[in-house]
Amino acid sequence: MFLFVAMISPATAAPTVFRFAGQSPPDHMATKMMEQMAKEINEGTKGRVEVKVYPASQLGNYTLVMEEMIRGTVDMACMSVATDFDPRLEILYANGYVTGYDAAKKAFDPDAWLPKKLNEFLTPLGVRLIGSYIEGFIGIASAKEAKAPLDPKVDKGLLTRVPNMVCYTAGAKEMGYRPITIPYPDVYQSMQTGVCDAADGYPTAAAYTILGDVIKYWYATNYSMEYLGYMVSDKSWKKLSPEDQKVFLDVAKKYTLKSIDNAKAEDEKYMQLMEKKGIKVYRYTEEQLRPIKEACMNSWEEIGKAGAGTELMKEFKQHLGNI
């Protein structure tokens, strides 16, 4: 009898269930990729791990989910990285370190300097970054034409909404824009009523879907990107065998690169939709964007002084200044 039980127990053992938290709507590409990842992890671990996807912030917003991952009550996430837990994490949102899709693949390869550095800050908190989701590049959406958009030394003549983060405020100034902080829900009305002329911080798709009726120009300056991290609770990670950990890492790397290819296609799709709507779209090569990248690099020192640390930003510049 004992022998019979021992023989069947491995085959009937219940799988380890991972709750995978997302912040995007159910029909969003980020959620679709989460579902594809869940399927491939389930298959790759031969059913030993069952990943269940919870989109649309069902398990909480990104800050709460980070807290839950630290506790081990949420296993993994595809969400914004909460910088509240360590100001050094804000390097992720620095402007100008990648201005194109090939550069993004180099910067966000899980074995590259930036993901490894981010893990130096996240692992002590109890969270591991295993990959990245790049939704799309960020440009300038404007109701008025910008003066010399590729020359950072020229005042653009645009009062520009920026997210309330040092990296965006400092970056906008270096690019020649006059920054003003306006809450995200109020940007449309602010542009409609002339409180501001332009908006910084919107990826291409969001600029079209949210601001498409109030903008006349889109400058694809690619100085930043909409970023989500594939993160795993360290407590949950330690429940996995080395073999199953490798499955997670391989799948996360695959979907990091896949997200960047998708971002390129989505950015172009929405720029074409802008053009059909009558919005003037300016596309640029990475070579044309080099002056903007160099201008944004001047803002990195300010990010260091604001809490990230000047030595860290020097290291950041060394590794990402010429990518």
Predicted regions and their residues:
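A gly/proline- and charged-residue-enriched helix-loop-helix capping module
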Residues: D102-F121
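Bacterial N-terminal signal peptides
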Residues: M1-M7
